[in-house]
UniProtKB/Swiss-Prot annotation:
Protein name according to UniProt: Pseudokinase OPG198
Description of how the protein assembles with itself and partners: Interacts with B1/VPK1. Interacts with host VRK1. Interacts with host VRK2.
Family to which the UniProt record says this protein belongs: Belongs to the protein kinase superfamily. Ser/Thr protein kinase family. Poxviruses subfamily.
Its biological purpose: Pseudokinase that plays a role in viral DNA replication repression by activating the antiviral protein BANF1 and inhibiting the activity of host VRK1, a cellular modulator of BANF1.
Cystine residue pairs: none
SUPFAM superfamilies for this protein: Protein kinase-like (PK-like)
Notes on how activity is controlled: Both catalytically active kinases B1/VPK1 and host VRK2 repress B12 inhibitory activity in a B1/VPK1 deletion mutant strain.
Subcellular localization: Host nucleus
Keyword ATP-binding attached: yes
Length: 283
């Protein structure tokens, strides 16, 4: 007879723990709700209580990604959904804490242009909501954008940043942060040690879009010093950037315009989300 490991969340729900999905700073497990089901439809993220990013992620889910607020926001705008996971459980032991979300599928790898356009709109909507709540995501990269049953999900809220100081003034641009993340998709501000602002989230999304549309990031496999140097140069010469991303000259004009608009944003500027979104809405 198979034996099961399990734990209880703060609401008393029992979660049966399956195989490890990922082991890094935090550990991800497949989990399920009961013994009768053989399907592990959920994922548990667990880490030591001393690891602050997981605590920050849990707090972000509770205080910012409130389901009722999301529902009201989407209904007011006529949006089908936001790429934000639902939280199904939070728990802790003497030494560890965890949260549970649905198994959200695989990394988004578009099969056609239509799905790319839809993904671009959904992600712009999602970032607009997060920004409207006074935060940035800070870690937009392909592995954090999943798809299941044609529904996207943006995961990993461990590096979110507050946009405003006390008094509702925008945070200042200061190059005093220790950078972290995937250098291929990192925004220039983050490379330089500044907190990711709204333009940074949208810039990182742009690098994901380039690959979704079949392009390549010219700085891949380069050192971090070369990566930031190239990104800074490409911001000055966008035409050259797209020649290197799409050597066959098949870059979508909508994507070029998106990058142009994002690259011209000031650090504290509120993006024109409608203008960005309309680039990818197909009639």
């Amino acid at each position: 007879m198979e034996s099961f490991k399990y734990c209880f969340d703060n609401d008393g729900k029992k979660w049966i723990i399956g195989n490890t999905l990922y082991s890094g700073n935090s550990i991800l497990y497949k989990v399920r709700k009961n013994f009768t089901s053989s399907f592990y439809n959920y994922v548990m993220k667990i880490d030591h209580k001393s690891h602050k990013p997981l605590l920050s992620e849990i707090r972000f889910y509770i205080s910012v990604l409130d389901p009722l607020t999301i529902d009201n926001w989407t209904r007011e705008r006529g949006i089908k959904y936001l790429a934000i996971p639902d939280l199904y459980g939070i728990g802790e032991t003497d030494d560890y804490m965890f949260f549970v979300i649905k198994n959200l599928g695989r990394v988004f790898a578009p099969k056609d242009t239509e799905s790319v356009f839809e993904a671009c709109v959904t992600m712009i909507n999602t970032l607009e909501f997060i920004h409207s709540r006074g935060f940035t995501h800070g870690k937009i990269e392909p592995r954090n954008i999943l798809i299941r049953n044609k529904r996207l999900s943006l995961i990993d809220y461990s590096r979110t940043n507050k946009l405003y100081k006390s008094g509702n003034s925008h945070i200042d641009y200061n190059e005093d942060m220790i950078t972290s993340g995937n250098i291929n998709y990192m925004c220039v501000d983050n490379h330089l040690g500044a907190t990711v602002s709204r333009r940074g989230d949208l810039e990182m999304l742009g690098y994901c879009m380039i690959e979704w549309f079949g392009g390549k990031l010219p700085w891949k496999n380069e050192s971090s010093i070369k990566v930031i140097k190239q990104k800074k140069e490409y911001k000055k010469f966008i035409a050259t950037f797209f020649e290197d991303c799409f050597p066959e000259g098949n870059e979508p004009l909508e994507l070029v315009r998106y990058i142009e608009l994002v690259y011209t944003l000031d650090y504290s500027q509120t993006p024109n989300y409608d203008r960005l979104r309309r680039l990818f809405i197909q009639d």
